[in-house]
């Protein structure tokens, strides 16, 4: 079937801000699909509220709306742009849910707009738990015994009939939101209440728990003519019971017999045909070990996290092909871009093994429960490729950037064999390392399998790795032993650790005496049956090299930013991709190194060459030895890339742009203080310390409050405000849980207004696209603050000082490329608090809203061009004639036990944008995009720390004027009443009813404003109240500045008045 020529203008719905369960994979899929549609001459209209994405760049779609992802806003866009079709399958659950609301309300029919890529019936059959169950029964596909419920008592009745444990799966939710495994009635009531609240249709599936069965996934494609293929099948190392996004996943499956593989493949093709899917689809199965019994767990009728993994694992561009199918093409009409010779109807074949390991945020949320269940907790993931499973696992583990280089991780020296046996029962992020320790202690693979239900094949492979550790410790390091260890991807540093040699000795022995070098193989979709046209490589130690490293033009190495995590998100991938594109245009051969399967940077056609490798010195050196690049770019890949600077210089690779010494000078307290003194720039007083005692002395000399933080970190990791000696002791203990190579900084904390700039510098001139102002006062991490462009409340004098200081600092640090500076404005004085001579998380946002492509300009500066010649002027750019507000988005509901109080350590996972002609409308849009929906009941809770009580009076007065009923803790209520604001006093957690907890559990409250005292004590009432508000779905604000901003937007804007701005036309 050729293309459907009636499709001329398509609205693509994006996935919105990054939250746990919905990360960069949808930017990758959406970008690929928009490019695929434009290739076919289709006009593409895009709506997505996330400014950090590549897909919201003005040249990816024809019209780009960075607007809140709500049904009402999408309706407005359809009425304005009049697309003939809507493609909702590339924006994850958010896009599917909006499409269903527009279809069910009759809006799409009224406007003559068609859904393409899927139908509402297809979405319903896959997403509605009752429809799905009925469809599976109709075609004879087995599901676990289950019932669909819309009330908690119905769930309890079913569970008591079939017995606990049971699994709760809400309909139309993402990343297992609201789901879980309940071991008893109390847990069931808790999980099911939450699940029904989060489900778009108030529906949950309660099913018999089959935890312990193998979890298998099939990624399938089907076209409109009914042709189907399986792109990839994947096996979760973790059995059923852990969300697939939190599981270690292996592709292709390793433990299935051919009969099992074919049985599930046939089932997947039957299901996709019955549900009538056109495009990509993911089917998840539970397979009972040692039998042919299986159950269908669920079907995702859209591009998903698993499709991104399958795409990168096989080289098959699922999103691109899905977009072509949506236009009417059949699989045999779509060429395979990797081989250039085959078509999309050829099933990929793999002659290597791929391992994905999730990246969890437990280093940021040390109080959060680490237990893994059916509700996802990972923020990102890493992928590795090798010719064997052991090698792929070892590569994936070191890609996580947690100082883990082998299976020998974690201190178990104080644990007895019995303790280790107990730890095997814990299902958390450390389980594979506990398995390795259990093997070392002589616990049999059979017993480990019995406890964990992880397949013996995987346990045996981990045993092979622990056996190699033993051999390296006990045997002489012969060439044969070294080669065997390298084939399992043991890094030189681990071989050195076990063999008692130094790293340099091992490296010299391997490279010079034994001549053992990494070889690179191609990912080609067809197990080398046809030659690949696109250069996409992975390393191994047991084969011929397949890379053509001949030099035709200058080569530049672009280092990516690794897995998505809090503090280092999709923004840095955005910067890496734009730097790569810019350098390619400047005539360089570009080489990307990265290991994140969700991102645009690891797509096969972004750079001239892609190396899917861990970002460690040894792995990068293997590439450098082969490619001999003329230079490397580290300033676009976040802290991951910056940390490789020293290693690259040792390899003889020049760092393009700002030199390593100047990056160090910005991080080194003493060197940086000298620069500030020379430039006559003030900063808050501070000291460097190494021990807790030194920190307490420094804090007392500076005077409380102080800021305590490690140096060389991203996202404010480990940063806290201390108000007394006990706080300093607690924070130092937490910081020192990780070995600190650098001193710890103690700074005087100033309660001023925080202002931020990103600038481009060529060594002489600077260009500042705009000045951004934070709504929250200093002390809340810039990534968690609401950011406003252009700054609204700074004077011209302060603005001039900021530009002057930026120019002086950029010149003193000899910045070539990007620099990010954070200032505090306190009593009209400007202080510098932080300087980062690299890209920052605000770069995509400021680029889009000012229409100044600063990554591209910085890349040109890095290559020697002058800013004055690039057509955007120098100094501070002219202000835009609209306001853009970047709003942080959090994923607290997925992390039970995490404190949501904001402070200097970053906690947000994503962001959205509000853009409008007026400040009030932009602010309202930003809150709307972040999912802060108010009001339903017009009832709120106000409880603030003593220091905030007087300021809380005006907040209470404004809420009262909006018609809110205020409940307040006794001390807060007393201050409000004394100042003429009526409030109902209530107890916090204990005491006479109704307490604050009772009010929250009664689902009558719209909003909680609770400003926390310092510290991480989980037993404090404030902590309990903040957690309960998140778990009952109530918006909770922990800063009065945020509360005032919300009030401003509520006082000034009604929903019907929202305007739309196409940023491609700015």
From Swiss-Prot:
Positions of region (Oligomerization domain): 402-547
Binding site residues for ATP 2: 709, 748, 750, 754, 779-782, 822, 834
Gene3D superfamilies in the record: 3.40.50.20, ATP-grasp fold, A domain, ATP-grasp fold, B domain, Carbamoyl-phosphate synthetase, large subunit oligomerisation domain, Methylglyoxal synthase-like domain
Pathway: Amino-acid biosynthesis; L-arginine biosynthesis; carbamoyl phosphate from bicarbonate: step 1/1; Pyrimidine metabolism; UMP biosynthesis via de novo pathway; (S)-dihydroorotate from bicarbonate: step 1/3
Limits of the ATP-grasp domain: 133-327, 673-863
Residues that coordinate or bind Mn(2+) 3: 822, 834
Membrane keyword on record: no
Catalytic activity entry: hydrogencarbonate + L-glutamine + 2 ATP + H2O = carbamoyl phosphate + L-glutamate + 2 ADP + phosphate + 2 H(+)
Cofactor: Mg(2+); Mn(2+)
Annotated ATP 1 binding sites: 129, 169, 175-176, 208, 210, 215, 241-243, 284, 298
Residues annotated to bind Mg(2+) 3: 822, 834
Allosteric domain as annotated region, ranges: 932-1066
Subunit structure as annotated in this protein's UniProt entry: Composed of two chains; the small (or glutamine) chain promotes the hydrolysis of glutamine to ammonia, which is used by the large (or ammonia) chain to synthesize carbamoyl phosphate. Tetramer of heterodimers (alpha,beta)4.
Family the entry assigns: Belongs to the CarB family.
Protein name: Carbamoyl phosphate synthase large chain
The species this protein was found in: Lachnoclostridium phytofermentans (strain ATCC 700394 / DSM 18823 / ISDg)
Gene name in the database record: carB
